[in-house]
C-alpha cells in the first residue's frame, strides 16, 4: 500500500487511540506541514484546509443536514440521477458508484431502494466515507436499510471494475471535472475537496471497463459545459439546469 501524507489531528473529546488506528488502516502518514488536515473530533472525522480555516470542515453525514433533507423532501424517483439509472416501478438496479466522492448520489439511490457499492481510491476520502457509513449504520432510523444497501470498497476503479462480482446493472461515474474560471465562487466544499484530490485526469479510461461490467447501462454525470467522457457521444441524457447525466449502453453481449 502506498502511503499518503496529510496532517492528522485529534481534538479534545476524541478517542485518543483512534487516530493511529485510522492512519494504519488507510495508509496515512502525518505531516505537520501539510496544508490539508484530517481531524478527528468527538463526533466525526473531518477534512480541513489549514490555510483557509473559514471554509470549515468537510465530512460525510448521511443522517442529518442536506442528505436527510434530500432524502425526505427531494424529488425521490423523480430526481435526475434516479431517472438516469433507470429506476421505475418494480425495478431497482444494482449500482456500482465507481467514483464515490462524498457518497451523495450513492446515498440517494440507496435511499430509493437500490443496492449500491461505492468505490473510492483516495484513502482520505475513503476514510471520510467509512466514518459516515459507520455513523449512519448506527442510526435508528436509517441504519437498518443503510447496512443492507450501501457499502464501500477502497480501490481504484481502473482495476476494480474488471473484478467485481456479481455484475451490476448500472455503473455510475461522476469524475472530478475542473471548474471554469468564471465560476470562482465554487462551493467551499468543492474547493477543499479539489485541493485534496485534484481532477480525475485518467477518468477517460473508466468508460470502457464500466460498459464492460454493467449489464444494462453506464451513467456519467457531467457539468453542462463539459465534453462527453472519453469523447464518446452518449446514447441519451437526462439534463438538469447545471449538469447532464449521459447514458451509455452496456457493451456486454447478452446471452442467446
From Swiss-Prot:
Its main location: cytoplasm. It comes from Yersinia pseudotuberculosis serotype O:3 (strain YPIII). GO terms for cellular component: cytoplasm. PANTHER family: RIBOSOMAL RNA SMALL SUBUNIT METHYLTRANSFERASE J. Pfam families: SAM_MT. It is found in: Cytoplasm. One of its GO terms (molecular function) is rRNA (guanine-N2-)-methyltransferase activity. CDD domains: AdoMet_MTases. Specifically methylates the guanosine in position 1516 of 16S rRNA. This is Ribosomal RNA small subunit methyltransferase J. S-adenosyl-L-methionine binds at residues 104-105, 120-121, 156-157, 174. InterPro entries: 16SrRNA_methylTrfase_J, SAM-dependent_MTases_sf. Keywords: Cytoplasm, Methyltransferase, rRNA processing, S-adenosyl-L-methionine, Transferase. Its EC number is 2.1.1.242.
Amino acid at each position: 500500500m502506498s502511503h499518503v501524507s496529510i496532517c492528522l489531528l485529534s481534538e479534545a473529546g476524541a478517542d485518543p487511540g483512534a487516530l493511529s488506528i485510522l492512519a494504519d488502516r488507510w495508509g496515512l502518514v502525518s505531516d505537520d506541514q501539510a496544508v490539508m488536515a484530517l481531524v478527528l473530533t468527538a463526533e466525526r472525522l473531518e477534512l480541513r484546509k489549514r490555510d483557509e480555516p473559514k471554509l470549515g470542515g468537510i465530512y460525510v453525514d448521511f443522517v442529518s443536514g442536506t442528505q436527510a433533507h434530500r432524502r425526505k423532501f427531494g424529488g425521490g424517483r423523480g430526481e435526475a440521477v434516479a431517472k438516469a439509472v433507470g429506476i421505475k416501478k418494480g425495478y431497482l438496479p444494482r449500482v456500482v458508484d465507481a467514483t464515490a466522492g462524498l457518497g451523495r448520489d450513492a446515498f440517494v439511490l440507496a435511499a430509493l431502494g437500490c443496492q449500491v457499492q461505492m468505490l473510492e481510491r483516495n484513502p482520505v476520502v475513503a476514510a471520510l466515507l467509512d466514518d459516515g457509513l459507520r455513523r449512519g449504520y448506527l442510526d435508528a432510523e436509517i441504519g437498518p436499510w443503510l447496512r443492507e444497501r450501501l457499502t464501500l470498497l477502497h480501490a481504484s476503479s481502473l482495476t476494480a471494475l474488471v473484478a467485481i462480482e456479481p455484475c451490476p446493472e448500472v455503473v455510475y461515474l461522476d469524475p472530478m471535472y475542473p471548474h471554469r474560471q468564471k465560476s470562482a465562487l465554487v462551493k467551499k466544499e468543492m474547493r477543499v475537496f479539489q485541493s485534496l484530490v485534484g481532477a480525475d485526469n485518467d477518468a477517460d479510461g473508466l468508460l470502457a471497463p464500466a460498459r464492460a461490467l454493467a449489464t444494462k447501462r453506464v451513467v456519467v454525470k457531467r457539468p453542462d459545459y463539459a465534453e462527453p467522457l472519453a469523447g464518446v457521444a452518449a446514447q441519451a441524457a437526462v439534463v438538469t439546469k447545471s449538469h447532464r447525466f449521459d447514458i451509455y449502453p452496456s457493451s456486454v453481449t447478452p446471452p442467446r
